[in-house]
Amino acid sequence: MNVAILIPARFESSRYPGKPLVALKGASGVAKPLIQRSYEAAVRVAGASSVHVVTDDLRIADQAAGFGAAVVMTSSECRNGTERCAEALQHLDSTDLVVNLQGDALLTPPGFVEALIEHMRGAVEAQVATPAMRLRSGEVRALQAEEAAGRVGGTTVVADGAGRALYFSKRLIPHLPDGALDGEMSPVRLHVGVYAYRPEALAAYAATPVSELEMLEGLEQLRFLVAGIPIAVVEVETPAFALRELNNPEDVEAIEAALAAAGLE
């Protein structure tokens, strides 16, 4: 199976302009731009046939080419990473599976992506897959504190009995009544922003209008659900280090600490 990992990256992030080029120090104190760290995370994945940085910005493209990454240039009309992957796919050779490893997902363990590839290899009917982690009650309380402080703390997902996503939200779902967090494990599953798509699912996504739910939540994957394209939720184990994305400038210190904890140079 020909698996292409695509790393969509844009310079004009609404929350953090220039984010892909932000320098982050690793375990040894060496600073590398975010896009390079995301690329290095991608090349550690077993089973990938190719890795490409996908962007519409020459500053990002030049930086990526400088550390040896293959680059696919896309138009500035792409509204999100999934649309960017769909456009980039048109410039690639025959591909059986596309993995969208978002440009700020530098701490994503290779095993998460490998689990998606394995799931899609075995479930031939699956069109889209994405990982999620079941959270401990203490981790949910930390997310509640982030939310109360007005910061984006993460996206949560609920799924049906067959493991297909019912909904994703930037709010904590499901509702947690009194006592829901009394045990060690919670009913909350944190979504990890990595996706595996069949090419036909990407084409269908690009041809589908933006949905109201997608706009309200600011979550691109909801377009699949609104269009009736199921998303398989693959449960993965929470890593030993904090799994953070660079969403806000305030996240830099925590991400550098996580890089050090993971032993990533």
Can you name each region flagged by the protein language model?
Residues 5, 51-53, 98, 129, ...:
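Hydrophobic/aromatic residues located in beta-strands of well-ordered beta-sheets
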Residues 11, 75-81, 238-240:
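Short, acidic/turn-prone active-site loops that include or flank metal/cofactor-
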Residues 108-211:
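Conserved core of the sugar-phosphate nucleotidyltransferase
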Residues 2-54:
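N-terminal glycine-rich phosphate-binding loop and ensuing alpha1 helix
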Residues 52, 58-118:
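Short phosphate-binding loop-to-helix
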